[in-house]
From Swiss-Prot:
It is found in: Nucleus. InterPro entries: C2H2-ZF_Transcription_Reg, Znf_C2H2_sf, Znf_C2H2_type. A zinc finger (C2H2-type) spans 174-196, 202-224, 230-252. It comes from Danio rerio (Zebrafish). Belongs to the Odd C2H2-type zinc-finger protein family. GO terms for biological process: angioblast cell differentiation; intermediate mesoderm development; kidney development; mesendoderm development; negative regulation of DNA-templated transcription; negative regulation of transcription by RNA polymerase II; pattern specification process; pectoral fin development. Transcriptional repressor. Regulates mesoderm versus endoderm differentiation during gastrulation to regulate kidney versus vascular cell fate. Acts upstream of pax2a in kidney development and functions in glomerular maturation, after podocyte specification. This is Protein odd-skipped-related 1.
Length: 264
């Protein structure tokens, strides 16, 4: 069974001061001027016409130029029609479209809503809206859509901060006033500056030899006590300083590398 478009329902509005319902049926194809509408019918009549257009799914009520004399027999003379200013949300004037090669194809009239096939009509309406959005992708967007896009940009992955550790704080650098060398600790800077000033605050009680660092004085005291706490595990030789033992171990490693070469 084919779809059949139902006739337009008669809007029941008590304040609609029109002669008969033929005005609404005629207004679908009639073009009325926006500046002459207050002299034809009142505010409530405009509201009823607006609801009539919206219910049937017609496009906005475009009103080109014409005169009141071209409307004979549409309005009953027995009912006075007061002049009330129009409001932009009730009657929307037609927008001036720029004349161009694609201007005629861009203007599409919205089809009537088919009450017999509600599901098909609703699906068709959504498809048209999606098509309009796709065609207007390169044109100027509305402010509300722009705000939504701005919010979407803010929530996009590109704007989100990277997870994980926060960036490390800038470390305090201690700069030598003599050579400009940087140090992360003040103690290291103090020891380094003593190389420039030749300051040796740590002195041996036995031989009165001075040292820049306290650990150097501690290692020196092992010489006088003849105590050698750092001993080599391979040859048993003792050393007063750990760094001297480290240099000694490198000699053993070099000997082990030379032995396989001699055997070959």
């Amino acid at each position: 069974m084919g779809s059949k478009t139902l006739p337009a329902p008669v809007p029941l509005h008590p304040s609609l001061q029109l002669a008969n319902y033929s005005f609404l049926q005629t207004s679908n194809g009639l073009h009325l001027p926006a500046d002459h509408m207050p002299s034809i019918y009142s505010f409530s009549a405009l509201h009823a016409v607006h609801l009539h257009q919206w219910t049937l799914g017609y496009p906005p009520f475009t009103l080109p130029r014409c005169t009141f004399s071209k409307l004979p027999g549409l309005v009953d003379a027995r009912f006075p029609l007061p002049s009330i200013p129009l409001f932009p949300h009730l009657v929307q004037p037609a927008k001036q479209e720029s004349s161009g090669p694609g201007s005629g194809a861009s203007s599409k009239s919205k089809p009537r809503f088919d009450f017999a096939n509600l599901a098909a009509a609703a699906t068709q309406d959504d498809a048209l809206k999606a098509e309009d959005l796709s065609t207007n992708n390169g044109h100027v967007r509305s402010p509300s859509l722009g705000c939504l896009l701005d919010v979407a940009k803010l929530s996009s992955p590109e704007r989100k901060p990277s997870r994980g550790r926060l960036p490390s704080k800038t470390k305090k650098e201690f700069v030598c006033k003599f050579c400009g060398r940087h140090f992360t600790k003040s103690y290291n800077l103090l020891i380094h500056e003593r190389t420039h000033t030749d300051e040796r605050p740590y002195t041996c009680d036995i031989c009165h030899k001075a040292f820049r660092r306290q650990d150097h004085l501690r290692d020196h005291r092992y010489i006088h006590s003849k105590e050698k706490p750092f001993k080599c595990q391979e040859c048993g030789k003792g050393f007063c300083q750990s760094r001297t033992l480290a240099v000694h171990k490198t000699l053993h490693m070099q000997v082990k590398e030379l032995k396989p070469a001699k055997i070959k």
